[in-house]
């Protein structure tokens, strides 16, 4: 009866979120009458539009564990700031002894990452990103580390609002401000070089 109810929920949920099961772990405990097995499932839910959630469910049967994990993932949804298909800046997410370096990438790069960071990034709607897993590569810890990184991402507008300042134009050589700053710096160096 519970499974029928959950299946109905799946139909309504499938239109809103995509799901991906990252792994199912089986544990056993030995009793006097024999061994009893339990299962733990790690599930990611995402709408490929900046919203993603993760959950772990435990039960005596795999389908029930997956349903529990999906319910937890729905409660733990976060919004990831996605700009032009990538993240706004480089960040390191941490959990326990796992650290994950997340870096923005240009168009056409794709998601270059391990299984867990790639799955989470794709369901969040990120199409270009670089990632490196540092420390422990335990799937649960890596997943939590990726979520830690995503939670701490800030757009330029959010940083401006937090600091109460204006966002300065980029000083890259491509922008007019950057070109003038570069030429002024070059002239200053040339002038001082002549004086010596």
Curated annotation (Swiss-Prot):
Which positions form S-S bridges? none
In the record, biological process GO terms are: translation
Instruction: Write out the biased-composition intervals (Polar residues).
Output: 170-183
What is the name of the gene encoding this protein? Answer: rpsE
The record's GO molecular-function terms, alphabetically, read:
rRNA binding; structural constituent of ribosome
Q: Name one Pfam family in it.
A: Ribosomal_S5_C
Name-wise, this protein is Small ribosomal subunit protein uS5
| Residues in S5 DRBM domain copies | 17-80
Domains (record comment)? The N-terminal domain interacts with the head of the 30S subunit; the C-terminal domain interacts with the body and contacts protein S4. The interaction surface between S4 and S5 is involved in control of translational fidelity.
Member of which family? Belongs to the universal ribosomal protein uS5 family.
Instruction: State how it assembles.
Output: Part of the 30S ribosomal subunit. Contacts proteins S4 and S8.
Naming one, the record's GO cellular component terms include: cytosolic small ribosomal subunit
Q: Residue ranges of region Disordered?
A: 164-196
